[in-house]
Regions:
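Low-complexity, glycine/alanine/valine/leucine- and proline-rich hydrophobic stretches
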Residues: 125-136
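Short, surface-exposed beta-strand/loop "edge" segments at domain boundaries and coil↔beta transitions
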Residues: 123-127, 150-157
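Compact, glycine/acidic-enriched structural inserts
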Residues: 144-147, 154-170
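A short local loop/turn or secondary-structure capping micro-motif enriched for an aromatic residue
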Residues: 136-138, 152-153
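A surface-exposed partner-binding patch
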Residues: 1-123, 172, 176
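Short, flexible loop/turn elements at secondary-structure junctions
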Residues: 119-121, 134, 147-150
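N-terminal processing/targeting junctions
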Residues: 138, 167-175
């Protein structure tokens, strides 16, 4: 039995949103689709990411802000996560969709550090990524924030994806300043 997300309700993570469903939420993935996505990406996705996507395969989080002391173009005390890419090929915003990993690496020239899995409200000018630089392509990646407007500065947010998800806060907890 998995020890990932012990005592945590994964169904509470996702917000109902028809636009995100249409563009980011993939159908449930099979082991074959997961293997094909990991092969195309060149990285083994962390078990915590896989388990969250098994509940809902992409979309928008209810708690969509991560506290940080690193100022960014969005806010001084947090970063906001928007759409989260599902595991698949069909939806435009899925990991291997038209607006997925290849777009961020090849057209936007984001650094090849791992898997870009979500954006912020800037529409692609800042991304959330699973950073495999220290752990290798099969290891447990950190979660980082990469901001294009700051010369692709990489800011570590969490030591792993589960910690990242557990640390998310609702946007109402932050001021608009």
């Amino acid at each position: 039995m998995s020890q990932v997300f012990k005592d945590f309700d994964l169904s509470s993570v996702w917000e109902a949103n028809s636009w995100a469903d249409e563009n980011y939420k993939e159908a449930p993935f099979t082991p074959e689709i997961l293997a094909a996505v990991e092969s195309e990406l060149g990285y083994k996705l962390p078990q915590s990411f896989i388990e969250l996507m098994a509940v809902q395969n992409g979309g928008i989080f209810v708690k969509n802000c991560f506290p940080t002391t690193q100022r960014n173009s969005w806010a001084k005390d947090h970063v906001q996560i928007c759409e989260v890419s599902g595991i698949g090929f069909e939806k435009e915003g899925s990991l291997c969709g038209a607006m997925g990993q290849k777009l961020w690496l090849e057209e936007w020239e984001y650094p090849p550090i791992g898997v870009y899995f979500a954006n912020d409200p800037s529409g692609g000018h800042a991304m959330f990524a699973l950073d495999y630089r220290e752990c290798g392509k099969d290891g447990e990646p950190k979660v980082v924030f990469v901001e294009q407007e700051s010369d692709f500065e990489i800011v570590e947010l969490a030591p792993d994806f589960e910690t990242f998800i557990r640390s998310l806060r609702h946007e109402d907890e932050f001021s608009d300043e």
